[in-house]
Amino acid sequence: DEKFQWQNTNTLSYADSFGKHHLNVMLGNELVFTQSRSLKAANNQFPDDNFGIYDLSLGSLPQKPESSFDETGLVSYFARAFYNFDDRYLLTMTLRTDGSSKFAKENRFGWFPSASAAWRISEEEFMKPLQRVISSLKLRASYGQSGNNRIGNNRYSSIFESNWYANGSSEIPSLISKTLGNPGLKWETTVSANIGLDFGLFNNRISGTVEVYKNKTKDLLLTADV
């Protein structure tokens, strides 16, 4: 067996501060290419057990050879912006698109935006009198989408595998259907929404989180019997 993977990631960042405003922006892209191949040959009934190590042809009961070749490509582009005002109001926005060779051309790319915001309530002026009790208090919320392409290659087209069938005293090579193709396959998408409250009491001797979230997945990628 042989496997080769090539990965290239490039990012460009910009950060600046003006007064109580802080901004950080990042742009990037990533390329991933994977290739694997395998070859299998076997034989049995050698005159001596050691012969098969050096020469498979010395056996008298050869097995059917097997070989495979597989390659996948993934390209991603992403952008992220983070804004912070006075360490009280925080905002993050992200947009990424991913393209996978595992899907047909018309469904190759998926778009996955996300955003999150947070308010450090404990930094507000009206919380000063309570600081001895409430050390930290932050309200946060987020919404976003993420993609999944964890399926085998070429599932959008029908796959055949080699086989042999008996014809009298001989075997004839043939092809049989392994899976039925689905050209409508596309990125599985999980939509996540979250709201939470983080708190710390008595100089953070006591801390905790109250959180509510909801995840919903659509366009599930799975194998079903027909």
Which residues make up each language-model segment?
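Extracellular/periplasmic, surface-exposed regions of secreted and cell-surface proteins
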Residues: D1-V226
